[in-house]
Amino acid sequence: MIMSYERFVLTVVVVLGAIDLTLIAAKGVRVDWAGYAMIGLIGLGTIMLGLFYRLVRQDARISETLILTAGFILFTLVGSVFNYMLLPVHFPRIDDFLVSVDKLMGYHWPSLVLFFSERPSFSALLKIVYFTSLPQLVIVVLLLGFTGQSRKLAHFHITGMMAALLSITIWAFLPTFGTSVVWNIPDDIANKAGLAVDQSYATELIRLSLEGVDYLSPANVLGLIGFPSFHTVMAAMSVFFTWHIVWLRLLVLALNILMVPALLLHGGHHLSDFLGGLVVFAVACLAASYAVSALRDDRAASALAERARALP
């Protein structure tokens, strides 16, 4: 009923969810249970719909797409809670160090902001590009799922999960919140550039890093991780998993080339964050490939065993 790679995804969700509940209870954090329950029910409902298509409609493409997507939705939910449960940070922030590393590479974020404040139309275009990350992933899921590329679909989802867990782990020991907590850009320049991440965002990140969280709600979740950049991971996933689609790959590549200045400018990322995101993607993608191969072998072995038991 549930394939091995689907079971893997859902097991990770359950384990991480149990850790979340333990940490919430231990820290006494108040929670918007209704808000999280709504998203959780959407995920569970999608799984049930996937099982309906598998068992009743006998449609493997739709069922795999729905179940794996539901697993990823639920993982995003429990993963964001886990990230917040690591607050306040327990190690020194390394943003100043990354600024010095960026300087060695010739990168200076305030100069980038100033450059685009003088070109507001281009900055507005990059802002649109910046917010295409999630829609791009949705399109990739639909393309892979509904064209029957189940191995690539599983590889895609497990890559995202592994990259997220690796990013959270790195951030827990090397916390960063991006350039906006280091540089105070004058309001007139920031307004001209139309930054997606403003000074109030940076102020809230600093507060959370010092005080932690006392109330969790999906309505006010912030992106906590600066290094490595998960926006970079998502961009790399979009390019990698559509590269075999000849008519689409150059469009996706062009869009995500623009994503680089977009995430630096509007995501308030260090250049080091971007490079770190590429490394995390490469490691997660390779590890996920091995995991999918192992899980596929397990699925094949299970199928053979079922056939053997069915023989007279």
Regions found by a protein language model. Name each.
Residues 15-24, 75-77, 164-172, 256-267:
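Aromatic-anchored segments of alpha-helical transmembrane domains
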Residues 2-41, 67-139:
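N-terminal transmembrane-helix/juxtamembrane module of multi-pass inner/ER membrane proteins
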Residues 28-33, 54-66, 145-155, 243:
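Membrane-interface helix-boundary motifs at transmembrane edges
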Residues 122-136, 222-241, 271, 275:
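Membrane-interface loop-to-helix entry segments
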Residues 173-244:
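Membrane-interfacial catalytic/cofactor-binding modules of polytopic membrane enzymes
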Residues 178-181, 226, 257-283:
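Interfacial helix-loop-helix junctions of multi-pass membrane proteins
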Residues 140-146, 232-249, 279-290:
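Membrane-interfacial alpha-helical segments at the cytosolic side of multi-pass membrane proteins
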Residues 64-72, 138-175, 179-190:
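Interfacial segments of alpha-helical transmembrane regions
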